[in-house]
């Protein structure tokens, strides 16, 4: 019977481990992600022009056609603005997980980069319009586009190849308030067939890939087009800011037209000094999850549920500590985020109330001046002596409002995570930091014990030796029989025994051992 019971109990740990393994595999299954490519420019053609408004007008036409299309009722509405001559295109991004484009080079630089080594961003040769100093190199109009890609956060720096050097475009993916409508020339888009075709393309692909962002692609069958509006355009010579060594790249051509679209040949550079030529890059929406041949990226679920569970099983109490710390950190982070939003709303409401109060005070002062002027004109004194009541002005205290402006974000004032030395931010996730914290704690504890081990051993041994020395010493008692001489030598003599009892010495008694 005992053997049968043992055989029945043996499969239970195996079943537990199998179920635990299946659970971990279910938690770590790959999730399908959407990846989009965003590219500007082409190696086969290049266009140089002077005014950034040309590009913004064309994009404005496309966005306006998209916004007014009946097929895009549920799609996001795109808006456009131009600040300091640079177009800005953005739309409110929905909330979602952090996802990056497959062809994008992700960086964490908050400012635009200059394409020349050692040049400051304010002294970049190609930062603004072309100048005389740019005649010895290629000039490509520098555009800054602020795009809100769906389900994307962070800062991107995308590069594309253009003859001469590799310019950089920085996409700042953060929330921007809706600007007023730009004051661009109102062009009649009825005679522009490409605008309607692009809008139709956007409408069709937006429903097919809702998680993909707008993509500018130079791939066929689309080609760059130049919009001609009330201007006769001719192109000849090496073009604007084109060096003599590359003159064989340029094809000379001329045409006379006042409106419509002109399809230029490849490697054709236009030298246009007026704001009537537009370069329209082809626009399409591509889902790289099916088109890309790259293997899909394996995305795990929350590290709190998968990796921390493995750490808890392997490390024991350390893993449990990491899991609890990661969960508490995640909850505290979400709580701080909500509190920051509420704090910002309260500060905005208080500032608006303060602004309204200042307006009320100014209106009251204006009414007071008007009443005083009216009373004096009618022959009376001012308002206060006439009604025989004290008149007071509202004194508004601005100290508390100033303190609100000096408040730091709640995430900087409340420490919810383990601080690195000198407040270094290594860009690690919460569970990784908690794991490193626990491992370092155990490592430091082990080092502390190793340093104190010799001292502890020495103290313990000295204490034991001291206790052994202070203990009473007893003679050894042997149970084996010894010869008579040994017993006689160990026992005292009779005179020595009776000498303490009486002064009279008794007769000697011969003592012998018992048989």
UniProtKB/Swiss-Prot annotation:
Keywords: Cleavage on pair of basic residues, Coiled coil, Disulfide bond, Fusion of virus membrane with host cell membrane, Fusion of virus membrane with host membrane, Glycoprotein, Host cell membrane, Host membrane, Host-virus interaction, Lipoprotein, Membrane, Palmitate, Signal, Transmembrane, Transmembrane helix, Viral attachment to host cell, Viral envelope protein, Viral penetration into host cytoplasm, Virion, Virus entry into host cell. The keyword Repeat does not apply. Residues 304-324 are annotated as: Fusion peptide. It comes from the Viruses. The surface protein (SU) attaches the virus to the host cell by binding to its receptor. This interaction triggers the refolding of the transmembrane protein (TM) and is thought to activate its fusogenic potential by unmasking its fusion peptide. Fusion occurs at the host cell plasma membrane. The transmembrane protein (TM) acts as a class I viral fusion protein. Under the current model, the protein has at least 3 conformational states: pre-fusion native state, pre-hairpin intermediate state, and post-fusion hairpin state. During viral and target cell membrane fusion, the coiled coil regions (heptad repeats) assume a trimer-of-hairpins structure, positioning the fusion peptide in close proximity to the C-terminal region of the ectodomain. The formation of this structure appears to drive apposition and subsequent fusion of viral and target cell membranes. GO terms for cellular component: host cell plasma membrane; membrane; viral envelope; virion membrane. A motif (CXXC) lies at residues 212-215. Residues 1-33 form the signal peptide. This is Envelope glycoprotein. Gene3D superfamilies: 1.10.287.210. The chain crosses the membrane at residues 436-456. Residues 34-435 are extracellular. The mature envelope protein (Env) consists of a trimer of SU-TM heterodimers attached by a labile interchain disulfide bond. Residues 330-376, 388-420 form a coiled coil. Glycans are attached at residues 129, 203, 230, 251, 256, 271, 287, 351, 398. The keyword Transmembrane helix applies. A motif (CX6CC) lies at residues 384-392. A lipid is attached at residue 455 (S-palmitoyl cysteine). Specific enzymatic cleavages in vivo yield mature proteins. Envelope glycoproteins are synthesized as an inactive precursor that is N-glycosylated and processed likely by host cell furin or by a furin-like protease in the Golgi to yield the mature SU and TM proteins. The cleavage site between SU and TM requires the minimal sequence [KR]-X-[KR]-R. The CXXC motif is highly conserved across a broad range of retroviral envelope proteins. It is thought to participate in the formation of a labile disulfide bond possibly with the CX6CC motif present in the transmembrane protein. Isomerization of the intersubunit disulfide bond to an SU intrachain disulfide bond is thought to occur upon receptor recognition in order to allow membrane fusion. Disulfide bonds join 212-215, 212-392, 384-391. Residues 365-381 are annotated as: Immunosuppression. The record marks 301-302 as: Cleavage. The 17 amino acids long immunosuppressive region is present in many retroviral envelope proteins. Synthetic peptides derived from this relatively conserved sequence inhibit immune function in vitro and in vivo.
């Amino acid at each position: 019977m005992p053997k049968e019971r043992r055989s029945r109990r043996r499969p239970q740990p195996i079943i537990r481990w199998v179920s635990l393994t299946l659970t971990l595999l279910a938690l770590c299954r790959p999730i399908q992600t959407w990846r989009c490519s965003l590219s500007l420019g082409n190696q086969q053609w290049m266009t140089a022009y002077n005014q950034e408004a040309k590009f913004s007008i064309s994009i404005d036409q496309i966005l306006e056609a998209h916004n007014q299309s009946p097929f895009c009722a549920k799609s996001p509405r795109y808006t456009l603005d131009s600040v300091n001559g640079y177009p800005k295109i953005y739309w409110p991004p929905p909330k979602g997980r952090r996802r990056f484009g497959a062809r994008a080079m992700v960086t964490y630089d908050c400012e635009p980069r200059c394409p020349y080594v050692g040049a400051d961003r304010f002294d970049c040769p190609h930062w603004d319009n072309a100048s005389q100093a740019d005649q010895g190199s290629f000039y490509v109009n520098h555009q800054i586009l602020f795009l809100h890609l769906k389900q994307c956060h962070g800062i991107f720096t995308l590069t594309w190849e253009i003859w001469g050097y590799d310019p950089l475009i920085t996409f700042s993916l953060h929330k921007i308030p809706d600007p007023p409508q730009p004051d661009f020339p109102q062009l009649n888009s009825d005679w522009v067939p490409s605008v309607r075709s692009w809008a139709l393309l956007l409408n069709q692909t937006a429903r097919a890939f809702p998680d993909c962002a707008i993509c500018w692609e130079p791939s066929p069958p689309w080609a760059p087009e130049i919009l001609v509006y009330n201007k006769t355009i001719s192109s000849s010579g090496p073009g604007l800011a084109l060096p003599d060594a590359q003159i064989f790249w340029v094809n000379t051509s001329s045409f006379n037209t006042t409106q419509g679209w002109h399809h230029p040949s490849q490697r054709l550079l236009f030298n246009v000094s007026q704001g009537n030529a537009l370069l329209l890059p082809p626009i399409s929406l591509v889902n790289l999850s099916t088109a890309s041949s790259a293997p899909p990226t394996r995305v795990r679920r929350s590290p709190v549920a998968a990796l921390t569970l493995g750490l808890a099983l392997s490390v024991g109490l350390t893993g449990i500590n990491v899991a609890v710390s990661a969960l508490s950190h995640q909850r505290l982070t979400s709580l701080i985020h909500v509190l920051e939003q509420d704090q910002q709303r309260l500060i905005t409401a208080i500032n608006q109330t303060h602004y309204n109060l200042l307006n009320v005070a100014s209106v009251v002062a204006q009414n007071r001046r008007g009443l005083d002027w009216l009373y004096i004109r009618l022959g009376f004194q001012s308002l206060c002596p006439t009604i025989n009541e004290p008149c007071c002005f509202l004194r508004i205290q601005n100290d508390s409002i100033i303190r609100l402006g000096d408040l730091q974000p709640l995430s900087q004032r409340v420490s919810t995570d383990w601080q690195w030395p000198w407040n270094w931010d290594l860009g690690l996730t919460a569970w990784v930091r908690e794991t490193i914290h626990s491992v370092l704690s155990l490592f430091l504890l082990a080092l502390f014990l190793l340093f104190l081990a010799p001292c502890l051993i020495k103290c313990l041994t000295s204490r034991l030796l001291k206790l052994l020395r202070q203990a009473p010493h007893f003679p050894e008692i042997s149970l084996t029989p010894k010869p008579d001489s040994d017993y006689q030598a160990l026992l005292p003599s009779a005179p020595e025994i009776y000498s303490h009892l009486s002064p009279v010495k008794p007769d000697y008694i011969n003592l012998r051992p018992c048989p």
